[in-house]
Structure formats: C-alpha cells, structure tokens
Amino acid sequence: MRSALCGALLCGAAMRVAAQERAVTFEEAAPVGISGFAVGRADYDRVTGSTTFAAGKIAVSLFKPVGDAYLFGQLTTALEDGAAATEIDNLLVSWTPHTANQWSLGFGRFDAPIGFERDDEPLNLIPTNSFTFTYARPTKFTGMQVHYTISPQLDVAAVAANGWDVTVDNNRGKTAMTRVEWIPLHWVTLGVTGVYGPERDSSDAHQRSLFSSDLTVDRGRLVVGAELNLGRELDSGVNPTWLGVAATAFVRLTRDIGLTARYDQMEDPDGVRTGIPQILRSVTVGPMWYFSSAREGIFSNIEHTRFHIPQVALRAAIRADWSSTPFFVDAGGAPQSSNTKGVLELVYVF
C-alpha cells in the first residue's frame, strides 16, 4: 500500500515537471491557407490581324500565420509571347508585434505600393494594363518594407529594394521608396510616393527618381481610381523625363453587372522608357459580369475600395491605342501609329 502511494506521488510529481517544461494548450495550429486564381482569354489585335485563345495564367497562393507574423507566397504560371513560364510572383514574410501593432515589417518580393493598377487580374477592374502601368513606374520590389500606422486616417511606409522589377540586384546600389497614405474621408484615399535609386545594369550612376500620386474614390456604385507618375533619370547633359497618367472609372449597373472605362497617357519625349520619343494614348471600355464573392483572404477587395473580389468574373473590353510616332508593329514588321484590340477574359478565384 505504501509503495503504491509513493508511486502515485512520484507520477504526479513527474507530470507536474513535464507540464512546466512544455506548455499544454488545446488550441489548434493555424492551417496553411491555399487560394489562387485562373485566367482564360480571347484576344483580337487589328494591327497583327490575329485572334488568339489562351489559358493565360494560373496562380497558387499560400498563407500561413505564425504568432505575430505571417508568410504569404504566390507561384504564377503565365503565358507570354507563346511561351509559359513560372515565377515566384510574391513571397512575403511580415511581422506585426502585438505590443506595437502600429508597426509592421516585411521582407521578400511584393507588389510596389504605387498607383491604382496591379499585375494580378483579380485586383483590377478591366482586362488590360495601361501604358502608365507598363512604362511609367515599378510594379514589383524585392527587398524589405516598413509600415507605420499613425492613425486610422494616416499611414506611412518605406521600402529598400534591389530596383525596379528586378529579382536580383543589377548593380551595387539600392532603390529607396517612401509613401504617405491619407484617408481624409471614409470613401477617399490619397497616396503620395517618392522613389529614388540607380536602375541601369552594372552602373550606380544615372540615378532615377519618380514622384507618384494616386487617388481612389469609392462611392458604392461608383469607383474611380487615378494615378500620376512623373519620372526623371540623370544622364550627361540630357536628364530624360517622362509622365504617365491613367484614370479608371467603374459603375455598378446591377447587382452582377458593371461597366468600366479607362483613359491613359504616357509621355516619353526622350524615349528612355518606351524606346523611342513618343506620346502614347489609350481608351478602354467594357462591361464586367461577376458572380459570387471570393472567400476572405489576404487580398479580398480591390485595394482602397469596398468592392469585394468576385469568385467568377467575365470581362470584355475594346481598346484603342494611338502613338505620336509609329510604334505598333504589324504582321509584316512595319510600325503603325494606331491599333485596336478586343479582349474577352474569364477570371476564376479559388
């Protein structure tokens, strides 16, 4: 009897020691969230005389919260110029300390927090990107970013990156970005951004600077997004400049149907961004039919709006392009000064 009692006491003591060494919890570890999207398209190009159907893109995203941090990664396989390629489109480790949650620190590859347009189709309201998005500003950074929320209406951010749209640094310098974002009204968001750094291969000279401003207005049935990008690059005695502006408007006509229009202008008088001195203009208009709402995730809304990303969206658009200098190459290799394109795009978010 005495030995049994001693054994029970020893077992109890051992269990208490084990409990002190390893905390007991009944909470389940947060699962890895898997989401993504797929894009199918039909394109018509008047200048080349081509009509093409394509399974254009598929992206798979992983999201994993770990304490005060989270990991977000996205692998994207896209078809471009007839060839498919897979890349790490986003890979971000972000940490927000619970004792100072107005701060957040991120590291990896991420969308440049500039302007209204994004490179992923579900995050846009129209199925083509503007000349301004393509030429006037960076779309991706690889580096680190810091965000500080001063108040619910004011946020500041800073980025140190390898450069404009490069995964590996192409020179010894780094590109710096600062951004201030202000919400004066609950339906208005204004952002001001500055970017500075060397961008040419194997050279720390020719510093490139960019001033960018973007405005988003969300009035429920009407969403307007506009951006202005003014850039300059230092060069011996020339200092070429460029200016890109774009404005997009979306009107919700019914519960499931909307209409989008965009005007875009890219002025490149020195040809530093487009290859030849020119002014590019485009007008794009088209309807969107959307059904159901995608599940909640790291990207659940069009940025700075209450427009919830639909699970299924069918979008059509007619786009007219003009250039002050022949720029659009036809099937015979001759440049033309104008072009017309038609697009039918299906986007499915899972």
State each model region's role.
Residues 1-5:
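Bacterial N-terminal signal peptides that target proteins for export
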Residues 8-16, 93, 321:
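Hydrophobic alpha-helical segments of integral membrane proteins
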Residues 10-12, 17-44, 295-302, 345, ...:
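N-terminal periplasmic/intermembrane-space "pro-region" immediately following the signal or transit peptide
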Residues 21-163, 172-176, 181-190, 248-260, ...:
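Outer membrane beta-barrel
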Residues 44-48, 92-94, 118, 188-350:
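Outer-membrane beta-barrel pore domains
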